[in-house]
A protein has these predicted regions:
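Bacterial lipoprotein signal-peptidase II cleavage site
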Residues: 6, 17-32
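Extended ligand-binding regions for polar small-molecule ligands
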Residues: 22, 33-37, 41, 83-84, ...
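Extracytoplasmic small-molecule ligand-binding "clamshell" domains
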Residues: 32-46, 52-121
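Short loop->beta-strand "edge-of-pocket" segments that line small-molecule binding or catalytic clefts
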Residues: 57-61, 79, 161-174
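Periplasmic-binding protein-like
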Residues: 63, 144-151, 197, 215, ...
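Acidic, polar ligand-binding/catalytic clefts
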Residues: 87, 99-161
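Short helix-initiation/N-cap motifs at beta->coil->alpha
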Residues: 100-112, 156, 173, 191-201, ...
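A ligand-binding cleft/hinge motif common to bilobed small-molecule-binding domains
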Residues: 109, 126-134, 180-183, 204-237
């Protein structure tokens, strides 16, 4: 009888011990899960502190877009309107414009690189759209553009209405331009390229009758080769914004503050005139 009671007590203690261990393990997993979630939130909200501790801010910029971001093959330096705006953001946040670091992006790669954490912000002729707002957060508008057409001088194509099934149009992958041109000229074949340099080379080679993107970008191409011209005015509004990772309101607020400062102190106008006063 005593032996039976002893066995029963031992069995009961074993059950209680296992239950306690299971409860502790569950609690540890739950705590770990909460910790990971908290770290994820901190990773977004604490980005400004991270940038200051790192003492540099990494921007995704174009390397192939004259007037906005164009790399000089001889020096390796990137220059343009977007580059100067990015430098001013670094100057206001970190006290030195040279603390801006630049990583090449294209229309296709910029959001993936941002979401991977390879860059802190995108300053790369990026149009603010409702669809993109689902993936990233935008600053206030820092440049107003509109989509247009670039053609060889003397081309019969002088406006969007002249595009037909026999007039191939060139555009860049991942840009809003490809969507807009298909909506505006549904009969015209659209050939897509990886970047603007490839698209412009294809236009020069006669692979299409027109190249379409934002007028400010096309203006840079026309200034590079005066045998091409912009025609037909604009057929869309393309407001550019600086993009950051979704939920990163702290960095958006800081960038908006810098843009406000640049516009109030005249620095924005000086940068604009530097790149677009081409007369």
């Amino acid at each position: 009888m005593k032996k039976l009671i002893l066995l029963t007590v031992v069995a009961l203690m074993s059950v209680l011990l296992l239950a306690a261990c299971g409860s502790g393990a569950s609690k540890e997993v739950a705590t770990t899960g909460e910790s990971k979630e908290g770290n994820a939130e901190q990773g977004v909200s604490g980005i400004l502190d991270t940038i200051k501790q790192r003492d540099k801010i990494v921007f995704g910029v174009k390397h192939d877009t004259k007037l906005f971001g164009l790399k000089d093959p001889a020096t390796g330096e990137v220059a343009g309107f977007d580059i100067d705006i990015a430098r001013q953001i670094a100057k206001e946040i970190l006290g030195d414009e040279n603390k801006a670091e630049f990583v090449e992006v294209t229309s296709k790669t910029r959001i993936p690189l941002l979401n991977k954490g390879d860059i802190d912000a995108i300053v790369a002729t990026m149009t603010i759209t409702e669809e993109r707002k689902k993936e990233v957060d935008f600053s206030n508008v820092y440049f107003e553009a509109g989509q247009s057409l670039l053609v060889k001088k003397g081309s019969p194509v002088q406006s969007i209405e002249d595009l037909t099934k026999d007039t191939p149009v060139l555009a860049v992958k991942g840009s809003t331009s490809t969507i807009n041109i298909r909506n505006a000229a549904p009969d015209a074949p659209v050939l897509e390229f990886e970047n603007y340099a490839e698209a412009f080379t294809a236009l020069k080679a006669g692979q299409g009758v027109a190249l379409t993107t934002d007028n400010a970008i096309l203006l840079g191409m026309a200034s590079e080769d005066n045998s091409f011209e912009l025609v037909g005015g604009t057929f869309t509004d393309e407001p550019y914004g600086i993009a950051v990772k979704k939920g990163n309101t702290e960095l958006v607020d800081a960038i908006n503050g810098v843009l406000d400062t640049l516009k109030s102190n005249g620095e924005y106008d000086a940068i604009y005139k530097k790149w677009f006063d081409l007369q």
